Amino acid sequence: MLYHLLYPLHTHISFFNVFQYITFRTIYASLTAFLICFLLGPFTIRTLARMQIGQYIRELGPQSHQGKAGTPTMGGLLIVFSVLVACLLWADLTNRYIWVTLAALAGFTTIGFIDDYLMQIKKRNKGLSARAKFLAQTVLAAGICLLIFAASDTNTVLLVPFFKRVAPDLGLFYIVLGVFVIVGTSNAVNLTDGLDGLVTGPLVISFVAYMVFAYVAGNAIISNYLQVIHVPGSGEVTVFCGAMAGGLMGFLWFNAYPAQIFMGDVGSLSLGGALGTVAIITKQEILLTLVGGLFVVETLSVIFQVGFFKATKGRRIFRMAPLHHHFELKGWAEPKIIVRFWIIAIALALIAVSTLKIR
């Protein structure tokens, strides 16, 4: 909105020329989202507590988590609100990718909201059935992919990190890949959200990494130099990623250990879905497994645990899955697990960004 209102004035007042720069608008989108979460955080916590919207703890989870019962949840709505406002203020609203990312965010927010709402009604840690949730996510992800590929300049080539000459064209199968990436990321982030601030930090790191990828993909000169796929218009997604990172940092102020508020499924499902959507738009789908390596490992720990348990009729690989619960039961303090996982996320993101130059 500010871009459309103020940038046209640059012919009269040269200062407003700064609104043409994506970097400038990304910085202020990030600050806007951060301030919204930071300033509205206490009000949100009080409101959720007054409405008795508290976290229900999984009965089979670690006993140490029982003390978290009743902590205000569904705080992800605050993050989504901050991102929406920041994008409406600072993004180019004529850019189709901004609306695709916001649509993905809104769609997965709706699924997460219904899931959390049902938990509050049932008064237990059980919302939508796994089948209903997966079906809703798949339909939504397919719609998002169709929106992305509706553009005439859409590229269905898959960029393979480290190999500049390996770029298979998947054709229509790319939509299947896109659905898998979006739904998989949404659920992986949801599984990782099990400790205070555990998923918030890596999400900040992931969106900062994709700020770089979006800017590079949207710039014809830089993308050609680095030999990555140029996606016209995708540079504006940098503003969206900046808003995401800022909103998450503002939320982390209250979500850090000991958490005063949880994001709930309305947060984890929506933010994961948005991250997967950004990966598709920027043509960095494979790198998401590295940037979000922590989410991948947490998800695989659950898959291996369940598979091994069924195959061996009761034996386990880990003391408990997802992986962070395994370390809890080994006696690691919660803050230590969180910080160490953050360190791993930072290292993985740095390696991922470095692949832009390693080809």
Swiss-Prot record:
EC number(s) stated in the UniProt entry for this protein: 2.7.8.13
Cellular location(s): Cell inner membrane
Gene Ontology terms: biological process: cell division; cell wall organization; peptidoglycan biosynthetic process; regulation of cell shape
Entry's Gene Ontology cellular component terms: plasma membrane
An example molecular function term from Gene Ontology annotations: phospho-N-acetylmuramoyl-pentapeptide-transferase activity
Broad class of where this protein is predominantly found: membrane
Enzyme class, spelled out: transferase
Function description: Catalyzes the initial step of the lipid cycle reactions in the biosynthesis of the cell wall peptidoglycan: transfers peptidoglycan precursor phospho-MurNAc-pentapeptide from UDP-MurNAc-pentapeptide onto the lipid carrier undecaprenyl phosphate, yielding undecaprenyl-pyrophosphoryl-MurNAc-pentapeptide, known as lipid I.
Catalytic activity: UDP-N-acetyl-alpha-D-muramoyl-L-alanyl-gamma-D-glutamyl-meso-2,6-diaminopimeloyl-D-alanyl-D-alanine + di-trans,octa-cis-undecaprenyl phosphate = di-trans,octa-cis-undecaprenyl diphospho-N-acetyl-alpha-D-muramoyl-L-alanyl-D-glutamyl-meso-2,6-diaminopimeloyl-D-alanyl-D-alanine + UMP
Keywords: Cell cycle, Cell division, Cell inner membrane, Cell membrane, Cell shape, Cell wall biogenesis/degradation, Magnesium, Membrane, Metal-binding, Peptidoglycan synthesis, Transferase, Transmembrane, Transmembrane helix
Primary gene name: mraY
Topological category with respect to the lipid bilayer: Multi-pass membrane protein
Protein name: Phospho-N-acetylmuramoyl-pentapeptide-transferase
Cofactor: Mg(2+)
Transmembrane region(s): 21-41, 73-93, 98-118, 143-163, 166-186, 202-222, 237-257, 261-281, 286-306, 336-356
UniProt-listed PROSITE patterns: MRAY_1, MRAY_2
Pathway(s) served: Cell wall biogenesis; peptidoglycan biosynthesis
Family: Belongs to the glycosyltransferase 4 family. MraY subfamily.
Superkingdom to which the source organism belongs: Bacteria
InterPro entries reported in the protein's UniProt record: Glycosyl_transferase_4, PNAcMuramoyl-5peptid_Trfase, PNAcMuramoyl-5peptid_Trfase_CS
Pfam family, one: Glycos_transf_4
